[in-house]
Amino acid sequence: AMGKKAARLGADIRLNTPVTAELIEEIKPHTVFNAIGATPIIPNILGKDQKFVVNSHDVLNGLATPEGNVVVIGGGLVGLEVCEYLAEKGCKVTVLEMMKECGADLGMARKICVQESLYMSGVVQQTEVTVKEIAEGKVIGEKAGETVEYPCDYAVMAIGSKSRDGSMIEAAARKIGAGYIKIGDAGMARRALNAVKEAYDAARTFDDPQIHGYLAKPQKVIAVTGVTGTMGQETLKNLLS
């Protein structure tokens, strides 16, 4: 719906189009919004490259479909979301967390709701576990100085995310004197609530030289990278308004 609305309002939407320095130079935008998001953190664990090891992004996007007995590595917000999702799909889920509790990054009210959901779904939580290796059919860790093993058909990496490298995009924007603004996870991986507010504010103030430090230009040609993502859509919506 957002894409159709943007097209009706005259936005030039280019799908399946990699962002290059040449493309930015061709468009000659007033401002470039970098909304290319984040990529999952993959820790350097022995066995991480095996076929039955997938990451949280691919699971939640439907690109990977674990089944059977699943071990989720990482018991933070994203890891618990993966646990709930897979439990609903009929998987038997065990989550491994290094800290003393799962969901330590959740607010108290939300944590209560999530923990209740995990309990009702039969998700097994194992805390204070440091994962050492992923072997065929099992995840090997260390707990209280002892080796522990968790059998699995699939292992899911859910450690967290890091911003994608946008240095080329920034350099291309600076080269032609365009403004450059990072929004959402492209600036720093964090929660959607904060990132959406940031995208809203950036779209409302992008041509204010006192805020963004470059001179406003009369022609408002804007380039938004990663426009199919949540942050890109929020920015586009407010630019068009």
Describe the role of every protein-language-model region:
Residues 6, 86, 239:
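Short hydrophobic alpha-helical segments of the AMP-binding
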Residues 32-35, 241:
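Short, hydrophobic beta-strand segments that form beta-sheet elements in well-ordered domains
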